[in-house]
Swiss-Prot record:
Pathway: Secondary metabolite biosynthesis; terpenoid biosynthesis. Soapwort saponins possess anticancer properties and are also being explored as enhancers for endosomal escape in targeted tumor therapies. They may also serve as precursors for vaccine adjuvants. Mainly expressed in flowers, flower buds and young leaves, and, to a lesser extent, in old leaves, stems and roots. GO terms for biological process: glycosylation; saponin biosynthetic process; triterpenoid biosynthetic process. Keywords: Glycosyltransferase, Transferase. Belongs to the UDP-glycosyltransferase family. InterPro entries: UDP_glucos_trans. UDP binds at W352, V353, H370, T375, E378, Y392. It comes from Saponaria officinalis (Common soapwort). The active site is at H27 (proton acceptor), D131 (charge relay). Its EC number is 2.4.1.-. This is UDP-glucosyl transferase 73DL1. The keyword Endoplasmic reticulum does not apply. One of its GO terms (molecular function) is UDP-glycosyltransferase activity.
Length: 492
C-alpha cells in the first residue's frame, strides 16, 4: 500500500543551490565535496568558476559517487587575464609562480563579480553557498531574496578563537611578540604566543580590512556550513552560536559523504612500497598544495626525517629559489630522494598525490602536517596522531586544538606566523625538533599510545556522524528541509 502511495505522489521540484569557491586547491576540493554531498540528496547543485579551474573540479567530481553527476553542473565566467596582466590559464592561487600574481588574481575575481551575479540570476537558485572570501554575496543574496550561507573551510574552534581575539583584543595587552596571551571566554584555557597570531591581526593591513568585510557579511548571512562534526568540537559549536546568533550546520567530514575514490597514474608504485611496510610504521609528511620551503629548511626536514628512524612518505613542493650554491652542491632534494630510494627508508614525491589513498593505508601510523583544516580533518578521520607545523591562515589555532584540547598531537615548535611568501624565511625549524616530534608520535611510549587511542575514538565518531542517524547526516537533512520551507514561503 505504501509503495503505491509513493508511486502516485507528485514529485517536488528539486532545490537549486549555487556554489562559489575561492580558486585554490583546498577550498575548491571542499566546495566540490560539499556540492556532491547535497547532490546525493537530489539537490541541483551548480559550481560557478572560471575555465582554467574546470579540469581540477571535473577530476574531483569524477572521483566521487557516479550518480552525483546528474545533479551537479559547472557554469563558467571568463577570467579577465589581459585586464589584470596575467598570462592565459593563470586563474588559481595554486598556479602562482611569483608573489605579484596573487593580487592580480584577486583583482580578476573582483572584476568578474557582475557577470557572476548575472549568471546567478539566470540560474535562479534557492540558496547561495559562498566561500567566505566573497563577502559581496551577502548583500546580493538579500537583493535577489534568497539565503546566503557561508561555507567555512575551517572548523568551529578557529572561528571561536578569532571571535575571542577580535572581541577582547588580548594581544594589545602585551608589548612583546614573544609573550603569551590568553584567549578570553573560550570553553578551554587557550594560550598562544603573540607572534603566532596573523600579522594582519597584530598590525592593520589591507587584509585586516578584508576580514572586517568578511565578518560583517557573515553576520548578515542566513548561516554557516562547517566541515566538522559535533563530537569533535561540540563545545565550540555551541559557543559560536551563542556569541554570534548565527545558525550553524556542521556537516563533515565532507570527504566521508562522497566516498572519494582517488587514483593517479604511477600510484601503484607508491602503494606497492607501502604494502611492504609494517602496520602503522610510516609517517606521512605534507604541507599542502601551496607552501614551498627554501632549500635550507628542506634540508633540515630531510635530516630530521632520516634520523628519526621511522620510514616516511614526504610529499614536497620545492621552492623556486636556488639557495646557497655551496649548500646546493653539498645537498639537494634530488640527491636525498635518490638516497632514500636506495635505502628504502623514505618515499619523496614531488607532485600532487591522492592524499586519502595514503592516509587510509594500514602502513601509515602518523602525519606531519601544516594543520590546514581539511588535511587535519582527513588525518583525524584516518585515526592518525599528528605532528603539527603551522604556517599561515588559521593553522596556529588548529594546532592549539590538536595539541591542547584534543591532545592527539605534538608541535615541532614553530613560534612565528608567516605569509605565503615568507615560508622558511622568518624561522628555521631544526632537524633536532623534527626528529624528536616524529619519534614521540610514532614511538611506543605512554604519551603516544594515549594519543593514538584518542584519535581512534575521534575517527570512529567521524564515521558515525555521516551515517544515517548521525549528527552530520541529520544536519544536512535539517538544512535542506529549512531551504525547502524558505522556498515555500517565498512562493506563497
Amino acid at each position: 500500500m505504501g509503495s503505491n502511495t509513493e508511486a502516485t505522489e507528485i514529485p517536488k521540484m528539486p532545490l537549486k543551490i549555487v556554489f562559489l569557491t575561492l580558486p585554490i586547491a583546498g577550498h575548491m576540493l571542499h566546495i566540490v565535496d560539499t556540492a556532491s554531498t547535497f547532490a546525493i540528496h537530489g539537490v541541483e547543485c551548480t559550481i560557478i568558476t572560471t575555465p582554467a579551474n574546470v579540469p581540477f573540479i571535473e577530476k574531483s567530481i569524477s572521483a566521487t559517487n557516479t550518480t552525483i553527476r546528474q545533479f551537479l553542473s559547472i557554469r563558467l565566467v571568463d577570467f579577465p587575464h589581459e585586464a589584470v596582466g596575467l598570462p592565459p590559464g593563470v586563474e588559481n592561487f595554486s598556479a602562482v609562480t611569483c608573489p605579484d600574481m596573487r593580487p592580480k588574481i584577486s583583482k580578476g575575481l573582483s572584476i568578474i563579480q557582475k557577470p557572476t551575479e548575472d549568471l546567478i540570476k539566470e540560474i535562479s537558485p534557492d540558496c547561495i553557498v559562498s566561500d567566505m572570501f566573497y563577502p559581496w554575496t551577502s548583500d546580493f543574496a538579500l537583493e535577489i531574496g534568497v539565503p546566503r550561507v557561508v561555507f567555512r573551510g575551517c572548523g568551529m574552534f578557529p572561528m571561536c578563537c578569532w571571535h575571542s581575539i577580535k572581541s577582547h583584543l588580548p594581544h594589545e595587552k602585551v608589548d612583546r611578540d614573544d609573550e603569551m596571551i590568553v584567549l578570553p571566554t573560550l570553553p578551554d584555557h587557550i594560550e598562544m604566543r603573540k607572534s603566532t597570531l596573523p600579522d594582519w591581526v597584530r598590525k592593520p593591513t589591507g587584509y585586516s580590512y578584508l576580514m572586517k568585510m568578511i565578518d560583517a557579511a557573515e553576520l548578515k548571512s542566513y548561516g554557516v556550513i562547517v566541515n566538522s562534526f559535533s563530537d569533535l568540537e561540540r563545545d565550540y559549536e555551541e559557543y559560536f552560536k551563542n556569541v554570534t546568533g548565527l545558525k550553524v550546520w556542521t556537516v563533515g567530514p565532507i570527504s566521508l559523504h562522497v566516498g572519494r575514490n582517488e587514483e593517479l597514474e604511477g600510484s601503484d608504485e607508491w602503494v606497492k612500497w607501502l604494502d611492504g611496510k609494517k602496520l602503522d610504521s610510516v609517517i606521512y609528511v605534507s604541507f599542502g598544495g601551496v607552501a614551498k620551503f627554501p632549500p635550507h629548511q628542506l634540508r633540515e626536514i630531510a635530516a630530521g626525517l632520516e634520523s628519526s628512524g621511522h620510514d616516511f612518505v614526504w610529499v614536497v613542493r620545492a621552492s623556486d629559489e636556488n639557495g646557497d650554491q655551496a649548500e646546493a652542491d653539498e645537498w639537494s632534494l634530488q640527491k636525498f630522494k635518490e638516497k632514500m630510494k636506495k635505502t628504502n627508508h623514505g618515499l619523496v614525491i614531488e607532485s600532487w598525490v591522492p592524499q586519502l589513498m595514503f592516509l587510509e593505508h594500514k602502513a601509515i601510523g602518523g602525519m606531519l602536517t601544516h594543520v590546514g583544516w581539511g588535511t587535519m580533518l582527513e588525518g583525524i578521520t584516518a585515526g592518525l596522531p599528528l605532528v603539527t607545523w603551522p604556517l599561515y591562515a588559521e593553522q596556529f589555532y588548529n594546532e592549539r586544538l590538536v595539541v591542547d584540547v584534543l591532545k592527539i598531537g605534538v608541535g615541532v615548535g614553530v613560534k612565528e606566523f608567516c605569509g605565503l611568501d615568507d615560508i622558511g624565511k622568518k624561522e628555521t625549524i631544526g632537524r633536532e625538533n623534527i626528529e624528536a616530534s616524529v619519534r614521540l608520535v610514532m614511538g611506543d611510549g605512554e604519551e603516544a599510545a594515549a594519543m593514538r587511542l584518542r584519535v581512534k575514538e575521534l575517527s570512529e565518531a567521524s564515521m558515525k556522524a555521516v551515517r544515517e542517524g548521525g549528527s552530520s547526516k541529520a544536519n544536512i537533512h535539517d538544512f535542506l528541509n529549512e531551504l525547502s520551507t524558505l522556498r515555500s514561503l517565498r512562493q506563497a
